[in-house]
Every structure is written in structure tokens, then in C-alpha cells.
Amino acid sequence: MNSLVALVLLGQIIGSTLSSQVRGDLECDEKDAKEWTDTGVRYINEHKLHGYKYALNVIKNIVVVPWDGDWVAVFLKLNLLETECHVLDPTPVKNCTVRPQHNHAVEMDCDVKIMFNVDTFKEDVFAKCHSTPDSVENVRRNCPKCPILLPSNNPQVVDSVEYVLNKHNEKLSDHVYEVLEISRGQHKYEPEAYYVEFAIVEVNCTAQELHDDHHHCHPNTAGEDHIGFCRATVFRSHASLEKPKDEQFESDCVILHVKEGHAHSHLIQQHVEKDSISPEHNNTALNFVHPHNDTSTSHESHEHLAEVPVAFVKKELPKDISDRHTTPVKGCPGKVHHFEL
């Protein structure tokens, strides 16, 4: 009898929680709105192929509407901010530091649709995002000497990454790493320097083979992929057009040990097979499928995100994310968790 009473109470609790979550009059700062948002942000971060994880900044709007039978649709408009955690970093986004404004911050606006079945608790998520760096004018207005973002394929950025990685490999006797992705480059002043961030992967070849154009190196696949992430500053003492030779530099490379089964472990091969230059910001990705163009700059660039296969849903679902369900509602937008660009 006690077990039966406990089961009934549990059912009432679940039912009460669920009815709260699927009601249509949620305000942006309510707990239930935050739970839907967490689902959307987690999905976005798990399916980004390049760059950094993003953290919630503002819930701009939330609408929950009945859809078809046991389904409800949750429409979210979110403003996110770039963190300092690369997408391959297993650190939970809640523990990642949001990139501060003086370090040329980047924001991302996302339209998210969550299809939720109130009977089976299954869900399907769609997202459409575009990211934009803070303007150079804003950065310089608030901090005239702060470093400015450069395109990831800027020659000085690429040369600085190669210089630091070569120095890193020279110190290792049994391990050789290759650039997986250049994710950030910035020009610093007084003294003049280039700041870079890039991901590296251990490969199955020697240092000599690494520099042989006829030899193809591949990531190690034994149990774990040894992924690293480097932050480095190269102080330029030679003419700006020359490659680094004997420059002073500061670097910090950490090994992430991305284990098999991690949300991004299957993306490593995709990184290696593509150009190592990270796609930049400021283009739209619908359902996380978008071609990329590496000639763009930090201010006219784009995301390239993982393709998400059609999930368990048997009925027809909308392919787009309509604006007709995202009109402003009471209590929105919500509070700003960090800062506005």
C-alpha cells in the first residue's frame, strides 16, 4: 500500500512539474523557461563543429504552444556569449569563463524550437544561429590598447601558430602534434605581438614525417584522442611580413584527453579532414548545416555546425523556425546574465 501511495504521489509531482513546463504563459526569468533554455543551449554546444562553447546571456523571448496531439512546441529567442572553452573541451559550459568585453567578445543570437511530447517525454530540437564579434569601434572606445580580433587565416596568425607548435613539438620526444583548428587570432600592441588560440591533435608520425609533404599523418585512435588546446603570444621583433624566426613567445598548451563517447569525439576526424582554419562569425546556420568559406574575416564570417540526423519523430515536423510564434510576451526579455554588446 505504501508503495502504491508513493507511486501516486510521484505521478502527481511529475504531472505538476510537466504541466508547469508546458504552459504557454512562461516569463523569461522563470525556472521553467530556464530549463527549456538549458536544453537549447546544450544542443547548440553539442553540435557546434568549430570555435567555442557559448553561455546564456539573455532569454529574449519564450512561447509554448500546443502543436499536434501530445506534442507542444517551445519557441525561444536567445542571446549567448562566447566562452573561453573550445568545443572539444569536455568542461561543462557552466564552468566555462565568458570571454570578457576587453578581449573582443563575441555574441550569438539563436532561434530555437523544441518539439516536446508530453506523453513519451521525447524531444526534438531545431536551432538557427548567427554570431557577431563586438565592433572594433566599441572595443577601442572602451579599451584603446586592447587586442583586436583578426581573421583566423591572417598570415601573421597562421605563422605564429606554426611557430609555437614547432617549438612545442621540439620539446617532445615521443609525441607529435598537428594543428587541428586555429580558433582565434588577435593583434596586440606595446609591445607588438600576435595572440593566438588553437587546438592540436596527436598524430601517428614522427617529427620528420610531419614535415614531409608526401607523408600523410593521421590522428591517434587508440582508446583516446589526445587533443590539446594552446594559448600563445608571439612577440614580433622582425619585419611584419617575415615569418617568425627567433622571436620570444609565451605559450600554454593543455591536453584535454577527449574520451570516446564525449559529445565531440566523433568530430575530430572531420576537423583533420578539413582546412585547419576555423570558420568565423556572422552567418546563419539552420539546423546546424552550412557550407563554410575560409576567406572571410572575423567581422564577415560564419559558423559550420554538425549535421543533425532526423530524430525519432515519425510525424512531419516543420523544417524552419517560424517567427509567427515569437511575438513579445509579458516578462520578456529576461535579465542580462553577463553584459550586452
UniProtKB/Swiss-Prot annotation:
State which residues carry a glycan (glycosylated): N95, N204, N282, N293
What is the annotated signal peptide range for this record?
A: 1-19
Please state where this protein is localized.
Secreted
The UniProt entry, under Gene3D superfamilies, shows: 3.10.450.10
Q: Which residues form the Cystatin fetuin-A-type domain?
A: 22-130, 141-254
> Which InterPro entries does the record cross-reference, listed alphabetically?
Cystatin_dom, Cystatin_Fetuin_A, Cystatin_sf, Kininogen_Fetuin_HRG, Prot_inh_fetuin_CS
Keywords per UniProt: Disulfide bond, Glycoprotein, Metalloenzyme inhibitor, Metalloprotease inhibitor, Protease inhibitor, Repeat, Secreted, Signal
SUPFAM superfamilies referenced in this protein's UniProt entry, alphabetically: Cystatin/monellin (SSF54403)
Where do we find the motif Cell attachment site here?
A: 23-25
Query: Between which residues do disulfide bridges form?
Result: C28-C332, C85-C96, C110-C129, C143-C146, C205-C217, C230-C253
Q: Which GO terms describe its biological process?
A: negative regulation of proteolysis
| Subunit structure comment from the entry | Homodimer.
Q: What does this protein do?
A: Potent inhibitor of hemorrhagic activity but also proteolytic activities of atrolysin C and jararhagin. Inhibition occurs by formation of a non-covalent complex between BJ46a and the proteinases at their metalloproteinase domains.
Question: Which family does the record claim for this protein?
Answer: Belongs to the fetuin family.
Name of the protein described by the UniProt record: Antihemorrhagic factor BJ46a
Q: Which organism is it from?
A: Bothrops jararaca (Jararaca)
